[in-house]
């Protein structure tokens, strides 16, 4: 009976995936990018996937920046350059578009007929790096900022220059990039274009880990230094703080002039695994079972995570009140909710104030309603889709 139930669950999930990911979009390599030095870690050209809009959405654009962490030293950047996160040679030719990228109204009611773009991530520093020199021993190229500009210029030439609406979105490292590039994206478009930015799971918190060490601060310092990112971070932040601090949204977002929507889990699974309890702070693996499934967490670990949530909320609320900043902070153990159909818009999607993520974002983009809600603490929200991992899923940084 148990095996039959498991098989039925697998079948239903498979049908959901088949139905919602029916659209596969071809890859496009950026023309003349290599000549401009706008390249992935391995020197290959950057890439994106574009599905053209139609009808009422023909002059509206949604740009989704791919996530995938960062590389903070030569060794892990060399490893990365042999994967899709460092080389367009390793990227799939056809990419499934679902959730916020879906072309079906029933799965993506507000953006289904927009021009929808997935910008591939292959620079390892959230599209911020720019180092001219290339070490011949490694052939590593740190050119994320050039990649960003080259892709945007090509999209402008393909019609984005005529956009009536434009949303810059992204997940994880892409969510951080959508936040940091928000105002520069606005500057690329005509004054008459309505421009907004959405950061999904990109609000990485500057905090100490369970051993009391500022692990993520040191990690970001290494990323910014290696990639030469300082000159490409928002000047409104770098004029006040060290460049590495400007990799943290809590020090950047207040100065962003373009309307911004922050979508994040207060118990973000990536942050729990890599900021709160990274491997270096947990040498005996006491947090491993908890990180794989929040239901396995000991009460003392839940207490630490509740404190993390309060610190996260303090950073978000500390941005100050804004009549243009949207917010959907749920209490789910998850990461990236715009790219998964069941989180974005489904019969049992996570809700706050009886509102799905897709509706909250859509209402904000179209100025129907300003959504600014923070969930009650775990485990109060029964609509959450808590992620369950295996030890092989995305090993910690």
Swiss-Prot record:
Q: Which Pfam families match?
A: PAE
Task: Name the EC number(s).
Answer: 3.1.1.-
Q: Which GO terms describe its cellular component?
A: extracellular region
The kind of enzyme this is, by top-level EC class, is: hydrolase
InterPro entries linked to this entry: AB_hydrolase_fold (IPR029058), PAE/NOTUM (IPR004963)
GO BP terms:
cell wall organization
Superkingdom classification of source: Eukaryota
Query: Which interval of the chain is the signal sequence?
Result: 1-22
Glycan attachment positions:
73, 353
Q: Which UniProt keywords apply?
A: Cell wall, Cell wall biogenesis/degradation, Glycoprotein, Hydrolase, Secreted, Signal
Which sites are catalytic? 172, 268, 335
Give the subcellular location. Answer: Secreted, Cell wall
Effect of disrupting the coding gene: Reduced inflorescence stem growth and increased levels of acetate in rosette leaves.
Keyword presence, Secreted = yes
GO MF annotation, one: hydrolase activity
Task: Indicate the family of this protein.
Answer: Belongs to the pectinacetylesterase family.
What is its biological role? Hydrolyzes acetyl esters in homogalacturonan regions of pectin. In type I primary cell wall, galacturonic acid residues of pectin can be acetylated at the O-2 and O-3 positions. Decreasing the degree of acetylation of pectin gels in vitro alters their physical properties.
According to UniProt, the name of this protein is: Pectin acetylesterase 8
């Amino acid at each position: 009976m148990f095996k039959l139930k498991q098989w039925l669950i697998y079948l239903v999930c498979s049908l959901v995936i088949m139905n919602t990911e029916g659209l596969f979009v071809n890859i496009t390599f950026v023309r003349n990018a290599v000549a401009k030095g706008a390249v992935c870690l391995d020197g290959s050209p950057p890439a994106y996937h574009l599905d053209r809009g139609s009808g009422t959405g023909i002059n509206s654009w949604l740009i989704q920046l791919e996530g995938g962490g960062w590389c903070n030293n030569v060794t892990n950047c060399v490893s990365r350059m042999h994967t899709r996160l460092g080389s367009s040679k390793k990227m799939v030719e056809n990419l499934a578009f679902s959730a916020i990228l879906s072309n079906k109204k029933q799965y993506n009611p507000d953006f289904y007929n927009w021009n929808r773009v997935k910008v591939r991530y292959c620079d390892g520093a959230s599209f911020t790096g720019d180092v001219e020199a290339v070490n011949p021993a490694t052939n590593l190229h740190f050119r994320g900022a050039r990649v960003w500009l080259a892709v945007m210029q090509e999209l402008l030439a393909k019609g984005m220059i005529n956009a009536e609406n434009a949303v810059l979105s992204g997940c994880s490292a892409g969510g951080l990039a959508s936040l940091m590039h928000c105002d520069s994206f606005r500057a690329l478009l005509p004054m008459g274009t309505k421009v907004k930015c959405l950061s999904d799971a990109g609000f990485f918190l500057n905090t100490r880990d369970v051993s009391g060490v500022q692990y993520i601060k040191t990690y970001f310092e290494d990323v910014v230094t290696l990639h030469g990112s300082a000159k490409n971070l928002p000047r409104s932040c770098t004029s006040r703080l060290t460049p590495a601090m400007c990799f943290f949204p809590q020090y950047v977002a207040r100065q962003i002039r373009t309307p911004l929507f922050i979508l994040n889990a207060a118990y973000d699974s990536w942050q729990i695994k890599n900021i709160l309890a990274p491997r270096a702070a947990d040498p005996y693996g006491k947090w491993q079972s908890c990180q794989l499934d929040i239901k396995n967490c000991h009460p003392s670990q839940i207490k630490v995570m509740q404190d993390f949530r309060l610190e996260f909320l303090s950073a978000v609320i500390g941005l100050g009140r804004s009549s243009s900043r949207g917010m959907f902070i749920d209490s789910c153990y998850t990461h990236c909710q715009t790219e998964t159909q069941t989180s974005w818009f489904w019969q049992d999607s996570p809700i706050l104030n009886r509102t799905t993520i897709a509706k909250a974002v859509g209402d904000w983009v179209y100025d129907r309603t300003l959504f600014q809600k923070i969930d009650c603490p775990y485990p109060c929200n029964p609509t959450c889709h808590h992620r369950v991992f295996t030890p092989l899923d995305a090993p910690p940084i």
